[in-house]
């Protein structure tokens, strides 16, 4: 049975050696946008689990949050340390396992993670552990791949041939995510989706060309003069509807303890 293991992530970050954060796609600002829409993080104690590059945690620290980042990949923590020093903010970095957090019950006002829950065949132990360290009334933000997207097909094909970078990964519909939150003792309060810009095909093409022939396409190509404004207007209109959450590549949701 395939699974996502620590060595997959160590290999991922080893491959990223020598890259700066400017070479790694961010999440388009969606995590910060949604957090600031739901709460004011100033003064809050915040934990990011599986922090990766720590970009969002660093931005939250700038906004006045008291931030802790946790990851079990040493290279990830090195990146966060370097970036937080450049930004001139204080971020606490902890090496650890998201299934066994080294914090007492009720330690945090906000816990969040992205690209994490989908790598566990049984997500409930992790969710319950994250709920454990939330204060009463605290918020958990979970950001995961959305089930009904062509990304899912390509991902499962790669997994079938043992070519998926993370070893194994699943996906969720927004309804499934909300049901998981309820089962973990949370009340879902807010959901959102993201279509990914630039799209998956462009990102894959850029990576292939860089690795094979050394061509470095721009990370964010200029939108076409006519199509760009139309596309933005469509996304703004349709993105306000719950039905859009069944078309996006990723979804996220908040649950309150």
Regions found by a protein language model. Name each.
Residues 124-139:
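A short glycine-rich, Lys/Arg-flanked "PGG" loop and its adjoining helix->strand segment in the class I
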Residues 190-257:
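A C-terminal cap/extension of S-adenosyl-L-methionine-dependent methyltransferases
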Residues 82-86, 157-158, 203-207:
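Short low-complexity, flexible loop/linker segments enriched in glycine and/or proline
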Residues 169-185, 191:
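Short alpha-helix
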Residues 1-100, 104, 110-114, 127, ...:
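Conserved N-terminal segment of class I S-adenosyl-L-methionine
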Residues 146-168, 179:
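Short, glycine-/aromatic-enriched active-site segment of Class I SAM-dependent methyltransferases
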Residues 115-119:
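A short His-aromatic
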Residues 142-144:
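Acidic carboxylate diad motif detector
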């Amino acid at each position: 049975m395939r699974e996502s293991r620590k060595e997959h992530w160590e290999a991922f970050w080893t491959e990223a050696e020598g890259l700066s954060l400017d070479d790694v796609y961010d999440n388009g600002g969606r995590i910060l946008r949604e957090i600031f829409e739901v709460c004011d993080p100033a003064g809050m104690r915040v934990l990011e689990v599986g922090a990766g590059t720590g970009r969002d945690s660093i931005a939250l620290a700038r906004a006045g949050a008291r931030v802790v980042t946790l990851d079990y990949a040493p290279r990830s923590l090195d990146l966060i340390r370097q970036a937080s020093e450049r930004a001139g903010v204080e971020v606490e970095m902890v090496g650890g396992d998201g299934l066994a957090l080294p914090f007492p019950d009720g330690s945090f006002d906000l816990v969040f993670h992205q690209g994490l829950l989908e790598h566990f065949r049984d997500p409930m132990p992790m969710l319950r552990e994250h709920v454990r360290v939330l204060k009463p009334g605290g918020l958990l933000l979970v950001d995961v791949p959305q089930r009904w997207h062509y990304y899912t097909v390509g991902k499962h094909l790669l997994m079938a041939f043992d070519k998926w970078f993370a070893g194994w990964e699943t996906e969720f519909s927004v309804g499934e995510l909300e049901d998981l939150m309820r089962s973990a003792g949370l009340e879902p309060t807010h959901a959102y989706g993201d279509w990914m810009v630039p799209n998956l095909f462009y990102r894959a093409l850029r990576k292939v060309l860089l690795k094979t022939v050394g061509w470095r396409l721009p990370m964010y190509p200029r939108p076409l003069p006519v199509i760009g404004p139309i596309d933005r207007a469509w996304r703004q209109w349709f993105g306000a509807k719950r039905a859009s959450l069944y078309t996006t590549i990723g979804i996220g949701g908040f649950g309150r303890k």
